[in-house]
Amino acid sequence: LILTLMISSCYGEKNSLAAIKSQIKINDTKKIISILSSDSLMGRDNKNKGYFKAADYVIKYLKNNNINPLYNEFKDIFYSDSIESFNIVWTVGKFLDGRKTILIGAHLDHIGISGVGADSIYNGANDNASGCVSVLQIGSFLSQYKWDYNIVLALFAEEEKGLRGSYNLAKRMKKESINLKYVINFEMIGKEMQIGENKVYLTGYEMSNLAQEIN
């Protein structure tokens, strides 16, 4: 919700928080988080293939909503420790070469299963199914409008192993001379902050002028 206001403020779109809330289906939010954090996905670790099952669900969701991949397919494949892994990357509207780009992302992976016991699965509802559902639903909302910038969305692999997925996508986008204006990453937003509802905490403040643009 906050991000849509941020982007709208950058481009002059008149969208109130109440108007945006009315278009976000909370039942869909709960459903997606429940699926991504279910025991059947085994903590979304690529070693036990839980990540691949989660990715299959996300890609099916994107296809069902007529969303287009940024590249030829949704999977942005890279190799980690000689094992194939991939980010999931898509775009809002048509991507135009040379145009400034905003990247909105979150990591899809989690830490899998640890030890043996009745509750040994790290389900990762907050870390980071909450961030993933935000990216999915924000993308759907933004697709209703036309923007002056490219908007790319991504769910990253292997964040828990050292930001490997986002690193590989950043390296690829730099090689392709994609002109990134802002990168906004959602992490563990499933719990309300003590400072109040609809408040966010922005890290990397000193790395860009995003806060000044919003204000």
Question: What does each of the following model-derived ranges do?
Answer:
Residues 31, 98-102, 147-152, 178-182, ...:
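Loop/turn elements at helix/coil->beta-strand transitions in domains of secreted/extracellular proteins
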Residues 15-23, 39-49, 76-79, 117-128, ...:
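Second-shell loop/turn segments in exported
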Residues 1-20:
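Bacterial Sec-dependent N-terminal signal peptides
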Residues 34-42, 59-68, 91, 137-147, ...:
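Sec-exported extracytoplasmic/periplasmic mature domains
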Residues 16-18, 22-53, 65, 184-191:
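N-terminal capping segment at the start of a domain
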Residues 44-93:
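A non-catalytic alpha/beta surface segment that caps or lines the substrate-entry region
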Residues 36, 62, 79-115:
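Acidic/His- and Gly-rich active-site-bordering loop/insert found
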Residues 84-87, 118-208:
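Acidic/histidine-rich catalytic neighborhood of metal-dependent amide-processing enzymes
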